[in-house]
């Protein structure tokens, strides 16, 4: 029911008109008997107020004679979360026992004595107070000269116990002790009734009635008011004390704005002024401040009955205050402006004309309002103000009943009041005991939270069931359907918590930290049912207390009203099997004050509505009804933004429709549609028919004197796409998918989104195919894992659908599937290495056809890290091999057989030489069978050569010798040839020494040559000597001597020394040459001598000395790359030509002997 109270007030500036919207959340309880519902109509100047109130009734209870109305105004709405919750140590100590008698169901006509619980947990409101400007700086405001009679008649409604709400007349009398004008506010109030009949409003005449004589109108003229302002003050005060909860008062209709829970208070003050930015509390003089609890009779704050704490303060503002200066108002730490919503923004302070004096901000942590003055204080002087602020017990800081000393302060000046905090009792009938309150209202999400205590008295309850209804319940626990329903279904959040035996529930009926209780919600998964907007929880037999937290949705009315009600009931069986019921209902009551202006009736402002339809546009053409499969979309969130930036949201119904009401003409609004999950907005303005097109996700509309029901929008399901293709074995390694190349199964493929987050993993099927589904448009990354035994093939060689894309590739989805992401692999090839170990009998490091392999030589293979990966032995032919090797670096280690010696290394081609004891080898895409090694047995050579040559020559000759000596010495290595003779000697010495391994050679040559020549000759000698020496590692000495002499000497010296390895050779050569002898000496010494003279002397000396000794050289143990060659030693094992020199000297001595002999003979011939 909506009661509209219109009042008029006169100030120095003339008539004013203000409005206050208030919301009260109420609660009432029912037993099995009658139900008493109490509603409190809040009247005052300010804005909206939300209160949680409850009424309790039992069948044997008595009812109060009447309820009283409080004049209240909203200050702020936000719960202060900075304080900590006190531990709940006080048990639920009270109960209202409602055991019924059969006759108790009859309605009683006598007044009852039952305690009525009107629990208000709500947003606060403030009374606009009069601020009087005594000395105003030049102003053009004029006072109306026309006499205005404002007459209000107040009639007392008869007391009727069948009515939910009764009223009683005000008994206050006019006072002349203070000068004050109170602007009144037009207020609209909505009382949501229950099962009880409502009182009949009394007829109200448009008169001002004296408070002390309700039936006699008091006519007051403007002139009287000017002369006696106190009279006006009393009239307004009496009017504000009048109970309007059940008596609508006729008033001039004014505009009623959409009602919202956020506070918009108005404080009546004198007039504005301006500049500064510092705190001026010392320039604020507090003239009066009081704290009033509820009706002020007992200072009991019945927190669940909607009893508020009213703080009144009157103060003056010093003329030194400038624009930007600030002042503070402090709440007590145990109260909050609102315990239902989170909106605590204080209202601006304005004067009766609406001009802003100061703007306020609220600090949740300190519970302090800071007002910043505007330039109003620069324009006006002697400003007086009175504020009335409402607050409520903070259930977080005061969880249980207690006594408090509340302290409020204006500009640092404090006042205090002792208060007793009282909380509700559980409703009890038999073993059924239950209580509940609304605890949180969220207008943005359109949800209401309710907390229910089940069995708070911890009785032993049998067959316990609890109903949560989206409407009120009657006294038998039955559901009362009607207006004010919430939505109770499977989407309703219902949490159940068990209270341990050692835990006490806070009496505040509000839990802030549920973690301290055991969450047993899951135990009710199969014990919870829904039917007809009711949830039923089956608790069975219990003896513990439980807490139920319910968060339900509601749908505001088209004109923005919060028409919300929700009930709960508990039923148990007694020992006879009869049910006992106890129940509570919580609901919101909306009140709205309006005020008249200037004594004339102002026509009520007409309000308008907007809205229409949201549908699924299957064919995406942006036009409604073009496809038979198109259908309305329910539960789409639609948000309306008002011109001041505030918002309101509603969801589309089952038919896709939505609607917003209470909109003003000429104002511009914005409607936004939330895109549902999995959908995309359709085409905008697809037709010229505004009733059939889609207006998009956001549309702005201006009200032009009529409703606009053409704001539609369409959505279509967001398409999903696939990505993937193929992994195959690229047998020919060309990176192209050929028809005969098979797929590879079980290859792991990973999909990542554009941020690198893994969103899917799969493996290829038996044919090598893979696919990722349900993907949106966008960029993706696909990673292929290389399967064991395979190598990735070349990539990007041809078209996308036939090539290989690499191990990591990017795929783009743009309104179509992408099935082109392929990857090819080929089987990784394996290789072998090895070859041969042989007995190198001739120690030359080369594999000869006659040399045999060595069996059972251990060969070890290491990888690049030095890890042994294989060991084998050579077979009977000396062969070995390692197989199944990948390309890479390896080391082959040969273990030297006992008694054998490593032969020389790297003497010839890789496949025929010896590579040494350790060989590094690299395999690159091919086998390697060139890793060989050879060994031989160790030997020792000792050669001792002792040569003793004694030559005695005595010659006496006179000769004329013409000697032509041509000495040609070709020496390999170091050759030292000294020839001083008239002879031709040709010496050819070939020495070949081949020594390997450890060989010890000791050669000792001792040559003793004694030549005694006595020559007396007269000789004319012409000698031409030509010596050419060429050294090339081979010594060839050729000496040719031509001698012409009368003497014929034939000397033959034969010396043969042969030394072989492993033998001791002693050579002793003794040559004796004597003149006058014919000597024919044949020496195996490659010496050729031609002599032409008077006497024929033919000396042919041929000396061939071959020393077949090997001087073994122990090779170094080296580790080298297989392809490097070591420098070869000389074949003799040494780089000198000692034996050649010995032969040369022997030949020279023989030639010298011949010359002496030849000279002697020539002398004799003469």
From Swiss-Prot:
Please give the InterPro entries that the UniProt record associates with this protein: Adhesin_Fg-bd_dom_2, Adhesion_dom_sf, Fibrogen-bd_dom1, Ig-like_fold, LPXTG_anchor, SDr-like, Sdr_B, SDR_Ig
Secretion signal span: 1-52
Write out the biased-composition intervals (Acidic residues). Answer: 908-918, 935-1105
Which SUPFAM superfamilies is this protein grouped with?
Bacterial adhesins, Hypothetical protein PA1324
Q: Which UniProt keywords apply?
A: Calcium, Cell wall, Peptidoglycan-anchor, Repeat, Secreted, Signal, Virulence
PANTHER family (alphabetical): TOL-PAL SYSTEM PROTEIN TOLA
Known role: Cell surface-associated calcium-binding protein which plays an important role in adhesion and pathogenesis. Contributes to the resistance to killing by innate immune components in blood and thus attenuates bacterial clearance by interacting with host complement factor H/CFAH and modulating its activity. Also inhibits bacterial opsonization and killing by interacting with host complement regulator C4BPA and thus inhibiting classical complement pathway activation.
| The protein's name | Serine-aspartate repeat-containing protein E
Q: Which gene encodes it?
A: sdrE
